[in-house]
């Protein structure tokens, strides 16, 4: 099931310049999700990171992983209209390859555990078949107040 940017924006609250998932390529609710982020030189982070040699910040790769996981949570629950997804922990984040404008980040997230409103994930970012980043993280789903 492919999910385009318009539908992604129906499922998560992030918007430009902080929406870091362009398309979902595959989703298996309650299990895993794969999506992409096309990295372009026009993104605001590249004005300062780094002007002479733009490099995607590692923290934004982790954010892309978390946003994709939030889409998985939303699709698994059927809706998050009355819920909010908050990142609680980031563990074992590793950055193994430079990501730069022109690259396509393939992001994959797997649900490792889900108990009540706490969800644990493992995620990777690959570029041209090479692991660029990997991380484990935990998110909490809360009712909107």
Swiss-Prot record:
Primary residence: cytoplasm
InterPro entries: FabA_FabZ (IPR013114), FabZ (IPR010084), HotDog_dom_sf (IPR029069)
Keywords: Cytoplasm, Lipid A biosynthesis, Lipid biosynthesis, Lipid metabolism, Lyase
Catalyzed reactions per annotation: a (3R)-hydroxyacyl-[ACP] = a (2E)-enoyl-[ACP] + H2O
Annotated Pfam families: FabA (PF07977)
GO cellular component, one term: cytoplasm
Highest taxon in the source lineage: Bacteria
GO BP annotations, alphabetical order: fatty acid biosynthetic process; lipid A biosynthetic process
Active site residues per record: 49
Subcellular location: Cytoplasm
EC number: 4.2.1.59
Molecular function, one GO term: (3R)-hydroxyacyl-[acyl-carrier-protein] dehydratase activity
Function: Involved in unsaturated fatty acids biosynthesis. Catalyzes the dehydration of short chain beta-hydroxyacyl-ACPs and long chain saturated and unsaturated beta-hydroxyacyl-ACPs.
Family that this chain belongs to: Belongs to the thioester dehydratase family. FabZ subfamily.
PANTHER family, sorted: 3-HYDROXYACYL-[ACYL-CARRIER-PROTEIN] DEHYDRATASE
Protein name as catalogued: 3-hydroxyacyl-[acyl-carrier-protein] dehydratase FabZ
Organism: Rickettsia africae (strain ESF-5)
The organism's taxonomic lineage, starting at the top: Bacteria, Pseudomonadati, Pseudomonadota, Alphaproteobacteria, Rickettsiales
Gene: fabZ
